[in-house]
């Protein structure tokens, strides 16, 4: 499958990339190179290979799931135009 200059123009437009008409042949050639590489990847036999996200198994460090108040309530509420009893106060919206 080959990318034409018109298709390269359309891809550039969809990607919101400004490409001069003189640069379209080079862009089309680069896109064709990318597609050729992807076609090569499709030829690789991966039957029986387990999906993986990386070559080294890693686990995220977990912290204790402890509920806290964030210890920043006063700092946050001092930026509010109106705060009452530890909460943001806003005008009534629904009657």
Curated annotation (Swiss-Prot):
Catalytic reaction(s) noted: L-glutamyl-tRNA(Gln) + L-glutamine + ATP + H2O = L-glutaminyl-tRNA(Gln) + L-glutamate + ADP + phosphate + H(+); L-aspartyl-tRNA(Asn) + L-glutamine + ATP + H2O = L-asparaginyl-tRNA(Asn) + L-glutamate + ADP + phosphate + 2 H(+)
InterPro entries in the record: Asp/Glu-ADT_sf_sub_c, GatC
One of the record's GO molecular function terms: glutaminyl-tRNA synthase (glutamine-hydrolyzing) activity
EC number: 6.3.5.-
Pfam families: GatC
Enzyme class name: ligase
Keyword Protein biosynthesis found: yes
Nucleotidyltransferase recorded as keyword: no
Bilayer-crossing regions: none
Biological process terms in GO annotation: glutaminyl-tRNAGln biosynthesis via transamidation; regulation of translational fidelity; translation
Keywords: ATP-binding, Ligase, Nucleotide-binding, Protein biosynthesis
Quaternary structure annotation from Swiss-Prot or TrEMBL: Heterotrimer of A, B and C subunits.
PANTHER family named in the record: GLUTAMYL-TRNA(GLN) AMIDOTRANSFERASE SUBUNIT C, MITOCHONDRIAL (PTHR15004:SF0)
Role of this protein: Allows the formation of correctly charged Asn-tRNA(Asn) or Gln-tRNA(Gln) through the transamidation of misacylated Asp-tRNA(Asn) or Glu-tRNA(Gln) in organisms which lack either or both of asparaginyl-tRNA or glutaminyl-tRNA synthetases. The reaction takes place in the presence of glutamine and ATP through an activated phospho-Asp-tRNA(Asn) or phospho-Glu-tRNA(Gln).
Protein family per UniProt: Belongs to the GatC family.
Protein name according to UniProt: Aspartyl/glutamyl-tRNA(Asn/Gln) amidotransferase subunit C
Organism: Paracoccus denitrificans (strain Pd 1222)
Originating gene: gatC
